[in-house]
């Protein structure tokens, strides 16, 4: 038996699902991503959401202005789908290289999604246009009906929304984002080449027991919510199999500490500083490090039809302690795995 490798050299990764927020928060969090990743799909759920080419161009510039000198980072912008969105605006943004993809949030599914889509039928002209021009649809795959249990919302979405949509628009490219269930893992694996998925580090590392047993851990609270162990294991097995239509999407979602540690706390894990090492740990635990680079750096570009990055980064296998918090202007930000000792980290 050989000793585990102490250095992992991989092609520079991309993050295919990222929240950067805006204003002072954006300026704080951007460097944690731009330091490591070549590109990131940036979520459009600002207040107000990014629904026009003009808004996306302006937001992209604010992101670029926050990238430190020496970082080579390209934000890939997305359009927030609404019931009233003009298909021509979406197509113009795609053709001009402003929009890389469009995001479907069911109304009120997650942070700043009150403008989201009330039904797929309401945006069918937009989706038909996307199918025609080859624009990927990114989906937060949960139903939001009040009578459906929060732990069942992803599985119900597959049968009631996702499958009918893909049957109707057979050429539409779809990314099932941040999948959290065995149902979704099986669905994506059994799908065709036009269906892919992203998985977060927290859904690979933890299940709902970690969040709820022995005290509520608000910094593990995200949406879709952590599920039971059987679902966590299915996700781990999917990435460890080398399946090539699943790729890195951190869903890093920063909230100030007082908005997380609250009587009605916000959903989201700020994992940008620790995500890549977390993924490496999971792949190592699953004896699947041979598939780690593809998950981080190859599968995503392949699905999107983009070139892979031509630079490389290294991760080192040495214990490091994660910072307890990161300073904001008037609060602090608690990173994923705050205060814990991690096994893998990006070589500085």
Curated annotation (Swiss-Prot):
Q: Which UniProt keywords apply?
A: Hydrolase, Metal-binding, Pyrimidine biosynthesis, Zinc
Per the entry, the cofactor note is: Binds 2 Zn(2+) ions per subunit.
Which Pfam families does UniProt cross-reference here? Answer: Amidohydro_1
Coiled coil regions in record: none
Q: Residues that bind substrate, according to the entry?
A: 19-21, 45, 140, 223, 255, 267
Q: Which cofactor does it need?
A: Zn(2+)
Q: Biological process GO annotation list?
A: 'de novo' pyrimidine nucleobase biosynthetic process; 'de novo' UMP biosynthetic process
The record's InterPro entries line, in alphabetical order, gives: Amidohydro-rel, DHOdimr, Dihydroorotase_CS, Metal_Hydrolase
According to UniProt, the name of this protein is Dihydroorotase
Q: What organism is the protein native to? A: Escherichia coli O1:K1 / APEC
